[in-house]
Amino acid sequence: MAASTSAQNAMTSSPYSMFGLGEMASGLYGQNTSMAGVTVGMREGMLMNIENPAGLTALDSCKLFAEASAFVKNERYRSDGSSSNAFTGNFSAFSLGGRIMRRWYMSAGVTPYSFVGYYFKSSQELEGSPGTFVTSTFSGTGGLSKAFLSQGFLLTKHLSVGMNLNFIFGNMTQNEIQSAMTVSREMSGRSFYADFGLQYHRPIARETFLTVGAIYGYKQRISLKNTVTVTGSSTEPPYNQKRVTQYLPQYIGIGSSLAHKKWTYALDYLFRQYGVLNSGDSRVKFRDSHELRLGVCYFPNGFSSS
């Protein structure tokens, strides 16, 4: 089998985004991205840490923060001797945050949750007909977005907790063309869910601060309205609509950071239960992921750690 791919989406060009809910967004922006994605134990006076909302309690209480993010990435894929390159980029997130009351901090915004964006062709020889090939074309666009309301509470001088209230929504379109037949699948879904964070933070020496944190997000069911339209076939019904059940994966993370003067060092461990996702193809299975992240930051003017 031979295949070729090319980008048709500004958010991703990955053929893997045709499975499940698409290619999952990292959820990391700004300083978190530049430090290899560490978030669990991060808290700074100018950092809106929505991955661990307990970190919001470190925000400068005299300021209102606004953050907009964009990204660019270069991807290369190979399949049976052929390869493709894609350079993509787009606006990715927007958020606002600051202190509401003495011990209460809040942030709100919109970020991507998953991306669907692919276009490729596959040619396969017909059994019993040497030299005769059937070409199938696959394409997809769309994805899910996340609107969030994050809240952080400073329970004591050294202990903070936080919670993200999230609304997942979006549409995905997938098309498969083979000879004269076209199968179009349109999926739309929405779901509410919450995730939680905890941080213990204290100075351990002069100009040296230690933070230990944890985050947790539970497995959440999401119902997708799945509409399938078939054209060019006399044997299949032209239209079918049904509900498909999918899941937002459970995850748990622990991490810590050490801030000393202008330097910050951080380490995270994250477990994500991707095995609960349904790929939509019996040949494709998702596996749980384990991530270990290590980040170092040098800030010339220094952050006001707390």
Each language-model region and where it sits:
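Sec/Tat signal peptide C-region and signal peptidase I cleavage site
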Residues: A3-A7
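Outer-membrane beta-barrel porins/channels
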Residues: Q8-S34, G81, S95-S306
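Transmembrane beta-strand segments of Gram-negative outer membrane beta-barrel proteins
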Residues: S14-T39, T57-N74
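Surface-exposed loop/turn and secondary-structure junction residues enriched for glycine/proline
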Residues: G27, V38, R43, P53, ...
